[in-house]
Regions:
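ATP-binding N-lobe of GHMP and related small-molecule kinases
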Residues: 1-101, 119, 123, 127-128
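Single conserved hydrophobic/aromatic residue that forms the stacking wall/gate
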Residues: 146-155
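Short, well-structured alpha-helical segments that form the helix of a local strand-helix-strand
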Residues: 126-137
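A broad detector of short, well-ordered amphipathic alpha-helices
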Residues: 69-70, 111, 132
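Short, small-residue alpha-helix embedded
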Residues: 107-120
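Short conserved loop adjoining the S-adenosyl-L-methionine
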Residues: 143
Length: 155
């Protein structure tokens, strides 16, 4: 069984400006943010069966409402051309970032899911490609990917 665990860092916006609304309903933003030492852990495991998401926080949905589910499904659709949810993966969330607190926990979890699946599925997508996919989920997703990628390159 192959698995990858990644820290999923919270962030705080020091300055946030909404520049306009895009055709997809999301906003164009200008922001200055700071990553925090507070993080969730996202573990993605390859195993047989349907997509399963588990979470130690009972108030977090573990179905298609979860941004992690949406990230896995979007990557699957984008690279494999399939509209069905991906199979043969389990995603476990260990939450430390308070939900709905404006700290970007869900976006960061989605970003780490994209990074982990890129490795596990051996897609070899570069960060720019992953960022474009992540941007379809929300403006904070690519920022989380970029920050974590920078941290990993320092290790």
């Amino acid at each position: 069984m192959r698995a990858i665990s990644l820290p999923s860092f919270a962030k705080i916006n020091l300055d946030l400006r909404i520049l306009g609304t895009r055709p997809d309903g999301f906003h164009d933003l200008k922001t200055i943010f700071q990553s925090l030492a507070l993080f969730d852990t996202v573990t993605v495991t390859v195993r047989k069966g349907p997509l399963v998401i588990t979470c130690d926080e009972p108030d977090i949905p573990t179905d298609q409402r979860n941004l992690v589910w949406k990230a896995a499904s979007l990557l699957h659709r984008t690279v494999r051309g399939k509209s069905t949810p991906p199979r043969d993966i389990a995603i476990d969330l260990r939450k430390r970032v308070p939900s709905e607190a404006g700290l970007g926990g869900g976006s960061s979890n989605a970003a780490m899911t994209l990074l982990a699946l890129n490795r596990l599925w051996k897609l070899d997508l570069d960060l720019a490609s992953l960022s474009r996919i992540g941007a379809r989920l929300g403006a904070d997703v690519p920022r989380s990917e970029e920050h974590t990628s920078e941290l990993q390159s320092l290790a």
